[in-house]
Regions:
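C-terminal helical subdomain
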Residues: 201, 219-277
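Catalytic Tyr-X3-Lys loop
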Residues: 116-135, 150, 154, 179
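Conserved glycine-rich Rossmann-like NAD(P)H-binding loop of the short-chain dehydrogenase/reductase
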Residues: 44-58
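A short, exposed helix-loop element centered on a Lys and neighboring polar residues
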Residues: 138-139, 184
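The beta1-alpha1 cofactor-binding region of Rossmann-like NAD(H)/NADP(H)-dependent oxidoreductases
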Residues: 53-54, 75-87, 120
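Canonical Rossmann dinucleotide-binding motif of NAD(H)/NADP(H)-dependent dehydrogenases/reductases
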Residues: 17-47
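Conserved mid-core segment of classical short-chain dehydrogenase/reductases
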Residues: 86, 109-124, 168
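Catalytic loop of short-chain dehydrogenase/reductase
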Residues: 154-178, 183-184, 188-192, 206
Length: 284
């Protein structure tokens, strides 16, 4: 699906241009929204970037209910479209002094099918959004941050980033594994070129959102089997819980090539050990 620049809407609300600014892609809902909500609570200017106009309007309303000194800027953008991302960056910099933090969060899930059952269009869209969108956004914001002599870019990992495999996640997992390599390579380049830009990875683990049972954004539903639900009930968490942890880490960070992990091996092991008497059910 092609999203032309003529459908590119901008909603700019009053605030201060002296605050730090964070851009989060795919932030009208779910994990991304929790990021902009929490940064707004901390008086950041927040840039909500998403492909869904309706979701953007709803996010805008909720964010305006939060008392903050920062601005709210919302953009309907397809992150695979270079002109749209570039135009958004230009527009943001007319409203604020700097873009201090950029979080590549936008992504879509894979239909629960084997690789040979997927149409090429589905494969292309998965790779375009989950991998190439992250690369493109990083490419476009890096020169801005280099010119500022400061900035932070974080890429959100997913299943497959740690080389895990699962039936029905072949393309999604491949894309996320590549995102990990790309992030490490970008961190190396940023360091060797002495850019003063910090690069990092956000590893949230299993989040209980519509993402886990919906493919390609608002596409077909994914039916989770009982075994998968059991694992999600043990290891999963709501996005607001994970985002709270991540935002504090990001604000405090002063290092390049970092990885912020919510579901550590120790935490996962403890969850399994205590699952017999600590019952949770996200699917009731």
């Amino acid at each position: 699906m092609l999203y032309l620049s003529c459908f590119y809407d901008i909603f700019i609300l009053e605030g201060s241009d002296s605050m730090k600014t964070v851009v989060v892609t795919g932030s009208a809902r779910g994990f991304g929204y929790e990021f902009v909500r929490l940064f707004r609570e901390r008086d950041y200017n927040v840039v909500v970037c998403d492909i869904s106009k309706d979701a953007l309007k709803e996010a805008e309303k909720k964010l305006l209910d939060i008392e903050s000194k920062g601005k709210v800027l919302t953009y309907e953008v397809d992150i695979t479209n270079e002109d749209m991302v570039s135009n958004m960056i230009t527009s943001v910099l007319k409203e604020v002094k700097t873009i201090d933090i950029w979080i590549n969060n936008a992504g879509v899930n894979q239909p629960d099918k084997a690789i040979w059952e997927l149409d090429k269009k589905v494969i292309d869209r998965l790779v375009d959004i989950d991998l190439k969108g992250t690369i493109l956004c990083s490419k476009l914001i890096m020169p801005v941050m280099i010119k500022q002599k400061s900035g932070q870019i974080y890429n959100v990992e997913g299943y497959g980033s740690n080389d895990a495999k699962k039936l029905g996640l072949s393309i999604y997992g491949t894309s996320k594994r590549a995102v990990t390599y790309f992030t490490e390579a970008l961190a190396l380049e940023a360091e060797e070129r002495k850019t003063n830009v910090l690069i990092g990875m956000i590893t949230p683990g299993i989040m209980i959102t519509n993402f886990i049972n919906t493919s390609l954004g608002d596409g077909e539903k994914i039916e989770l089997d009982e075994k998968t639900k059991k694992v999600y009930n043990i290891l999963g968490d709501y996005p607001e819980t994970i985002a709270e942890f991540m935002v504090d880490k990001i604000i405090a960070n002063k290092k390049n090539n970092v990885q912020f992990t919510w579901l550590t091996n120790r935490k996962a092991a403890w969850r399994f050990m205590t699952s017999g008497f600590n019952k949770r059910n996200f699917f009731e």
